[in-house]
Each structure stands twice: as structure tokens, then as C-alpha cells.
Design a protein with these regions (language model features):
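Short N-terminal signal/transit or membrane-insertion segments
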Residues: 1-2, 76, 208-209
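Basic, flexible linker segments flanking DNA-binding modules
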Residues: 1-44, 109, 119-128, 200-204
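Hydrophobic/aromatic-lined pockets within catalytic cores
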Residues: 6-9, 81, 184
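C-terminal domain-tail junction helix/linker
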Residues: 14, 20, 25, 34, ...
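RNase H-like DDE/DDD metal-dependent nuclease/strand-transfer catalytic core used by mobile genetic elements
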Residues: 37, 42-61, 69-177, 181-182
Length: 210
């Protein structure tokens, strides 16, 4: 009887409310290099032209963003490998004018073998250990923990990849260099309408005074 009443609508079902997932808000870091987020974005296939398109190439953009100043460094590679993560890291250390204390990444094989082997360290992890840089991994399937670099990739898509094309990796990196200069000098509301370069300059000047 109860089932029949429910079926014809005499008894209303109680709707269960889905619990909304609340993403924890992290405190803003105050020291450049205290934590740097790194991630990889695959270059959209429709951006490829000429030989790159004919050969079925895939390009990948490595991105690092300092959580304090939002200063970024980007570079493109043809292969999605731990070895290219190391190359990118070495370039990053030359580009950022401050000491990096911690690097935060997802669990991709270009960064860690944690979920393939609990004992074997990836080449990237070994390199970080040699350099004395902490490596922080975000939980699996939680890209919002790397939210700053994820948002920067969405901005890259909107302001760069939606408009540009590339025939080879050299052309990608030439154009990325100009885009990086623009993004590092663009004012941001989250930085009180300062650019990453302006905030970095202020932080370094303040450090020199003390």
C-alpha cells in the first residue's frame, strides 16, 4: 500500500540534500619562494600547424607559479617526461630571483612514482632532494589544491592559446616568452592591483632593508 501510494504521488519522497564540497581556503604566503606550484598543460592540438601537425606532434607547457607574488615561469617541451621536469626545474632556479623552499605538484609520473612504487623515487624527486627543496604532493584527484597554477592555465588558454598557432617547439617557446612577460607585468585584483613583478620588487626591497 505504501509503495502504491508513493507511486501515484500521494506520499512525497524526502529529497536528500547533497553536501556541497567546501574547498579549504589556504592562508596567503608572505615570502617569495616559500611555495611554488608546478603543473603541466598539454598544448591544444588545434594550435599546431605545418610540420608539427603533419607529424602528429604533442607539445607540453610546464608552468611554475610562486604562491606569494604570482610570478610565473613557463617553457614548452615535446615530451611529457620526468627528465623534462628536471630540465624545467633547472631553468626555473635560474629565472626566479629568490630561493625556493617548497615545490608543490600533482601525482603525475613526470613528478613522482608514489602511486606506482612506495620505494622508488622519480628522477624529479631525486633532483629536488639533491637541491634541498621540499616536495609537497597534493591528494589524488584534487586539482583545486594547485589552484593558482590551474587558474593560470585557464588564463593561458583564454589569452594565448585561443589565438596562437605553432609550427614547431621553437616557435611555441618564442611566443610563450612574450606571453610570460605580459602575464608577469599584468596587474591583478588578488594582488591589490599590482603586477607580480611589482609585488616581487616590493618584497625584495623590503627584505634588503631588513
Amino acid at each position: 500500500m505504501i509503495y502504491e501510494a508513493k507511486r501515484i504521488g500521494l506520499v512525497k519522497y524526502k529529497k536528500t540534500k547533497k553536501k556541497s564540497r567546501k574547498h579549504r581556503r589556504y592562508p596567503e604566503l608572505l615570502i617569495p619562494g616559500e611555495k611554488v606550484q608546478i603543473d603541466v598543460k598539454e598544448v591544444p592540438y588545434n594550435c599546431l600547424r605545418g610540420k608539427a601537425l603533419r607529424d602528429g606532434k604533442h607539445f607540453y607547457q610546464w608552468t611554475a607559479i610562486d604562491e606569494c607574488t604570482r610570478m610565473r615561469f613557463v617553457y614548452g617541451f615535446e615530451e611529457h617526461t620526468p627528465e623534462n621536469s628536471i630540465k624545467f626545474l633547472k631553468m626555473l632556479l635560474k629565472e626566479f630571483p629568490f630561493k625556493i623552499q617548497t615545490i608543490q605538484t600533482d601525482n603525475g609520473r613526470e613528478f613522482t612514482y608514489k602511486y606506482q612504487s612506495s620505494e622508488v623515487k622519480s628522477p624529479f624527486e631525486i633532483e629536488l632532494n639533491k637541491l634541498g627543496i621540499n616536495h609537497k604532493l597534493i591528494p589524488p584527484r584534487t586539482p583545486w589544491h594547485n589552484g593558482k597554477v590551474e587558474r593560470s592555465h585557464r588564463n593561458d588558454q583564454r589569452h594565448f592559446y585561443d589565438w596562437e598557432t605553432f609550427r614547431n617547439i621553437e616557435e611555441l617557446n618564442t611566443k610563450l616568452k612574450g606571453h610570460l612577460e605580459w602575464s608577469n607585468n599584468k596587474t591583478m585584483r588578488t594582488l591589490d592591483y599590482k603586477s607580480p613583478m611589482q609585488l616581487l620588487s616590493e618584497k625584495l626591497e623590503l627584505k634588503s632593508i631588513h
